[in-house]
Amino acid sequence: MARIAVLCGTGMSALASQLASAPGAAVNTMRVDSEWGQVPATLVSVDEDEVLIIDRHHSDSGSRTPPHGIEHRANVHAAASFQPELVLSINSVGSMCEELPPGSIGVAADVLDLAERPWTFYDDHATHADRTSCFNSGASEVCAKALEDTQGQVASGLVVAQCVGPQFETPSEIDALERLGADVVGMTLGPESRLVAERGILHVALVCSSNWAAGRTPGSPEAEIDHDTVDAMAATMRESVGECVKALLS
């Protein structure tokens, strides 16, 4: 039996329904208690495998927690309480990498997180988690192979820059991040990678290119970034994400 916890957000609201469409699948919704608040989650069981899906934004019909307001400790605590073999983060990003145009999915290898806010489970006792290899190479390779079957070329080994949001970045910020080694930029993976490392769980991250980063749209460097368009683009990649989940379970 395989158990995977999935942390997802933009464009992935129907991921649980997609996985639940498999023959014999069962779906249960639940709320996981934590000292940082309750976390809504969906458990999808297929044969002997289980996938716990957590919408990091805790979206419902009336509201959606903005990226800077997400309580990542609650989400990662809920994921860890499931005792998964692996945590899969699915992150919508802006791309500054020609090999990762909007509509394609890449595989993260590292995080560039210089945000000032600390994220830790250990506020009262100094505990230092190693982050030399944030993401499991074996699981990353499984995802890359699954993506090759669905989209062909796959950008892997990507460095994900963390920005706090909720505003999109400026072209100058993107230029600076690229000089520091970033390939893509997002608003959620940095805290998740820190907290998953503290819990000692294997981690893999898919980056869904939903837009060109600010100032990087080919032929139109002044093109604006619109969240509705970003969300719609992310949703087009949901089936490929589902194939990665299936590959990780096998």
Residues covered by each model-derived region:
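His/Asp/Glu-rich mid-to-C-terminal helical/loop segments that flank catalytic regions of hydrolases
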Residues: 214-250
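Metabolite-binding pocket within alpha/beta catalytic cores that recognizes anionic/polar moieties
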Residues: 1-129
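Active-site rim beta-loop-alpha module in soluble metabolic enzymes
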Residues: 134-179
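Generic hydrophobic/aromatic pocket-lining and core-packing "Φ" positions
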Residues: 76, 174, 190-193
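Zn-dependent metallopeptidase/amidohydrolase metal-coordination segment
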Residues: 187-227
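Alpha-helix C-terminal capping segments
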Residues: 78-83, 99, 180, 194-202
